Amino acid sequence: MPRKGPVKKREILPDPVYNDKVVAKLINKVMYDGKKSIAQKIVYGAFDIVREKTGKDPLEVLEAALNNVMPVLEVRPRRVGGATYQIPIEVSPDRRLSLGIRWLVEYARERKDKRTMKEKLAAEIMDAANNTGGAVKKKEDTHRMAEANRAFAHYRW
């Protein structure tokens, strides 16, 4: 625990093409081994595919996808009297965004239907914007867990 007050959050710079911080976070999440230029090619290529297939602005489609993927509730384990309960808690806005981006990229990587990562990412973004796909299913599962454990909500800290 730091003694000099709360830890400062690092400010992320917006990406060069769309000048958007969410896109910059998406690029950082796609990046492997510090290879940012490759991650940028993947994300911008996926955005080109989204623009081509939907005819809409890819930022709007990404925003719609993230709104359908970001969880409102999640469960956290808490020990109470020798038993561990799964306690539903609200998710902070920063964590909602990072979970949404993480799940989009994770389920895009797992897809078997496309060949390249940019095709997979574009397909996952479009599916999430249409309320389908693996990332949306993950959010629904998370909400279902929170709803099932609603009886333990009074143990919140």
From Swiss-Prot:
Name the Pfam families for this protein: Ribosomal_S7
Describe, as the record does, how this protein assembles with itself and its partners.
Part of the 30S ribosomal subunit. Contacts proteins S9 and S11.
Q: Which family does it belong to?
A: Belongs to the universal ribosomal protein uS7 family.
Q: By its UniProt entry, which PROSITE patterns does this protein fall under? A: RIBOSOMAL_S7
What function does the entry list? One of the primary rRNA binding proteins, it binds directly to 16S rRNA where it nucleates assembly of the head domain of the 30S subunit. Is located at the subunit interface close to the decoding center, probably blocks exit of the E-site tRNA.
Whether tRNA-binding counts among this entry's keywords is yes
What keywords are assigned to this protein? Ribonucleoprotein, Ribosomal protein, RNA-binding, rRNA-binding, tRNA-binding
> Record's Gene Ontology CC terms?
small ribosomal subunit
Q: Which domain of life is it from?
A: Bacteria
UniProt name for this protein? Small ribosomal subunit protein uS7
UniProt keyword tRNA-binding, yes or no: yes
CDD domains per the record? uS7_Bacteria (cd14869)
User: What GO biological process term is on the record, naming one?
Assistant: translation
Q: Which GO terms describe its molecular function?
A: rRNA binding; structural constituent of ribosome; tRNA binding
